[in-house]
Amino acid sequence: MGRSPASSCLRLISCSGGDDTSADPNSTALENKSSGDKRGWSFRKKSGKQRGLITSVVSETTPASRTRETLESALLKSPSPDNNNVSEKQQQSFSVDEKKSQLPVVTYVAEPVDEKKTQSVIEEKTELLSVEEQIDHRTEVSPVIVESKGTETEEDDLIGTELQGPSAADAAKIEEDVTSEVEMASKVEPEESESDDVIIVRKESDEKVDEKLDESVIVVIQAAVRGFLARRELLRSKKVIKLQAAVRGHLVRSQAMGSLRCVQAIVKMQAMVRARHSTKDGSRVSATSDKSEPNAAAQKLLENKFAKHLMESTPKTKPINIKCDPTKPSSAWNWLERWMSVPKPEKTSKANLTTEEQNLEETQNVKISPQADFVNSDSTVENKTETDMPSYEASKVEGQNVELSETEKMSQYDSPEASAEVYYDSIQSQPLAAKPDSLLEEPEYVDGQIKHSLKRKVSNPSFIAAQSKFEELTSSTGSNKAMTLSSKDDVLGEEGKTDIDSPDTTNTIKDHSLEDVTPAELSGSECGTELSVTSSLDTLEKKSDAEGAEPRVEAKLLEDDTFKTDQAELIEIDVKDATSMGTVEDPKEKVENAKDEVEISATHHEPVISTPDSKKRRAEDESGPQAYALSEGALTPMTITESQATPASQASSSVKARKGKSEKSGSSQKRKVSKKITSSPKQEIGTGEATEQEEGKEQKSGRRTSFGYDQEARESSGGKNSLPRFMQPTQSAKAKVQEHNSPRSSPDLQERDVVSAKKRHSLPGVTNGKQVSPRIQRSASQAQQGTKDRKWQR
């Protein structure tokens, strides 16, 4: 049998070193055919990646079934005789070793071969004996490299297997090792590279190392590392914070030093500017007084320890960057200009203050110095009159004048606005007389605050009308009173004893009004106008006290007709007193009260006529334009106080003008004076049997009734009670007043009034149950009837 070229593939198996493979080129063609035969019956897709051999380890990414196919294909390279042609040769080969015959049986079952391909292979393989010999003599199978070319998209695969074992047992061991390795590789994804296989091996080694280490040791190591990192970060943050604090402290200190230097420079410049102004104006005293304050402040600032430390630590010659350009708006320039502004000393204001202080001292001296003359004149005049003022009244007037300066200061400094209002009301309610300049300059004492309050008051139109009316009345009153006083001095002929001037009376009246009004204002009332009404009523009553000393030089015997006219005047006055508070609160009664007030205000201009027709003429004359003017004024409290102030003074002055020559012995006068001083107010209220005492008590009770109904009118008007409840008149006093009341046209009452009036020579006009004239008693009865009717109407 000749050898065919196909036997070259068998030579590859026979060579152990693999040197013949490179020499024989036909072996590659046979292997390509066998791989093509394999592709024909293989149903699995080959991977496109190359596989290489690793020493002692077979690394494959294909599953176990694919590795078995490659193994079986490698085993097919061994001679597989056909059933028909090579039966004898197979029997000979299997007889040599039965164990080796198992391998081809396994391959036949696993891999069936097509008939056409097997026939071509059988034809090429002619020499089978040589194969048997090689199987007998060779213990190792050389590695067969199968090169299989896939499709166009697949890459060439290089599969290398190393099979050891001359027997079937060795082949079985090799197969088991390959399957175990394939199972380990199957755990990895099929598309991993050779590096992944190395990583798997390393992981196994790490697991072995971890099993050996203890967990406590690992925790200690981790804690140490973390602590070191935290400490390093903390030190880094501390260093940053220290650096920031140092920079900020430097900046703050420099800024504080700059501000301190600025303040010090400003203080020095202010001192220089003030010194220059003082030398320029000539007023060194004011400059030094102003200069002491900033120096004290600068010293206090520089004595601070922190300021000293800053001043010492920084250089003194540090420039201050300030742009002194007044044309351009700059915050630094404005700040410096504001601190450097120095007010000029006002010479005019200081001069005015000095003159006003001198006027104050003069007026206080005037108010206090004539007091002795006033008391002396009272004592001399009492020798010629039957009735007199009680002794405690004189002491009261004296005490009020002495305490004037203190009350004036308290009213000016404690409540400037309230004092301004009260002072203005008290001045306006007085009858103006001989020294108008000194009286009119006084409201300007409280640093201009009174001027503001007066401006606010003048803005009221009703107040303007009332003020204009009051000025006309006071001007005429002053002239009439001056005339009556001059005539009185001529009649009396005693210049030293009866030296009672109008300024003295105005000053005393001003004292009473100030002393009574300021407590009312300081008591915390809500309405200033209401307080002005009450204070003006009190001032009216106290005016009658002060003026009661003047008409004591009256004549004892007067004619009946003159008494009637005087009685009519005083009735009108007291009717206004009783109804004045009603006009403030009740708007329905304004018309009636307006008529009464017109009658009162008109009495200043009318001459005193001793005929009973004078009342009718006055009523007709006054019902004209004056009533309209007062009704237009809306009857403010100021008009009430103004209209109340003048009638009492006018009545007293008119009585003084009509005085006859008084002819009465001093002894009889002193006896009656002593009797009336010892009499108590309770005895004055009670009724007596003697006609003279009864008439005198009627006069006193009449005055008490007018005062009581004045208070009752205040209560009914809904305003605040100026007197407490225990000082108001009792029911018994009111009942006694009602017994004496009768119609105005009653002839009995007129006769009784004439008899009592013959013995009356003065108008004391004292409140709180003191002696009064019967004229006021009749006015009180009319006021009582009017108030009763109004109550029933309500």
From Swiss-Prot:
Disulfide bonds: none annotated. Pfam families: DUF4005, IQ. Its main location: nucleus. Residues 487-500, 539-555, 585-607 have a biased composition (Basic and acidic residues). SMART domains: IQ. Residues 214-242, 243-265 form the IQ domain. Residues 15-101, 277-296, 375-417, 472-555, 578-794 are annotated as: Disordered. GO terms for molecular function: calmodulin binding. It comes from the Eukaryota. A motif (Nuclear localization signal) lies at residues 657-664. GO terms for cellular component: chloroplast envelope; microtubule associated complex; nucleus; plasma membrane. Residues 643-654 have a biased composition (Low complexity). Residues 230-241 are annotated as: Calmodulin-binding. Residues 23-33, 56-65, 80-95, 473-486, 768-786 have a biased composition (Polar residues). The modification Phosphoserine is found at S78, S80, S142, S193, S195, S369, S459, S502, S544. May be involved in cooperative interactions with calmodulins or calmodulin-like proteins. Recruits calmodulin proteins to microtubules, thus being a potential scaffold in cellular signaling and trafficking. May associate with nucleic acids and regulate gene expression at the transcriptional or post-transcriptional level. Binds to multiple calmodulin (CaM) in the presence of Ca(2+) and CaM-like proteins. This is Protein IQ-DOMAIN 32. It comes from Arabidopsis thaliana. The lineage of its organism: Eukaryota, Viridiplantae, Streptophyta, Embryophyta, Tracheophyta.
